[in-house]
């Protein structure tokens, strides 16, 4: 699957966002090593701490389905009803969650609508805390 196709699926996933507080919808598409794709959208909550980011919705859906190998995740975000206009990178909690189930080679694909930026998870969370830290 191409980066562009994965970005398209992340953009489609934004439609399922529940974001009445920020008015920012985010979609994610996670590519598993067997070609399966899981999508997610952010789900907000009035008390904020229970809010779940799109990346974790996709990741936890994949893990719940028994997947453990991941190749790439695409993230697309912006104000509800508008095309993406800036990069949305995974927050620290999402980076940590992704690192639990992938090595530093997971490709993180982000777009501002005009250009695409690709980083590895290792670049985004250097010296990350993993099970090897025990």
Question: Model-predicted segments: where are they?
Answer:
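Zn2+-dependent cytidine deaminase-like catalytic core
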Residues: 39-134
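Active-site segments that bind and position negatively charged phosphate/pyrophosphate groups
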Residues: 22
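Short, basic/aromatic recognition patches
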Residues: 4-19
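Short beta-strand scaffold segments in enzyme catalytic cores
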Residues: 25-31, 109
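Charged, amphipathic alpha-helical segments
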Residues: 3, 8, 91-95
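Intrinsically disordered terminal and processing segments
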Residues: 1-4, 112
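Small-residue (primarily alanine) positions within well-ordered alpha-helices
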Residues: 10, 28-29, 58, 62
């Amino acid at each position: 699957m191409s980066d562009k196709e994965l970005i398209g699926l992340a953009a489609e996933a934004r439609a399922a966002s529940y974001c009445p507080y920020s008015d920012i919808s985010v979609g994610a598409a996670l590519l598993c090593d067997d070609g399966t794709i899981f999508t997610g959208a952010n789900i907000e909550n009035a008390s904020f701490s229970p809010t779940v980011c799109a990346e974790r919705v996709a990741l936890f859906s994949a893990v719940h389905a028994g997947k453990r190998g991941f190749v790439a995740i695409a993230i697309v975000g912006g104000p509800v009803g508008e095309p993406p206009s800036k990069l949305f990178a995974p927050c620290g909690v999402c980076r940590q969650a992704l690192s639990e189930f992938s090595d530093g080679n997971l490709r993180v694909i982000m777009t501002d609508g005009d250009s695409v930026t690709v980083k590895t998870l290792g670049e985004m969370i250097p010296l990350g805390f993993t099970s090897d830290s025990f």
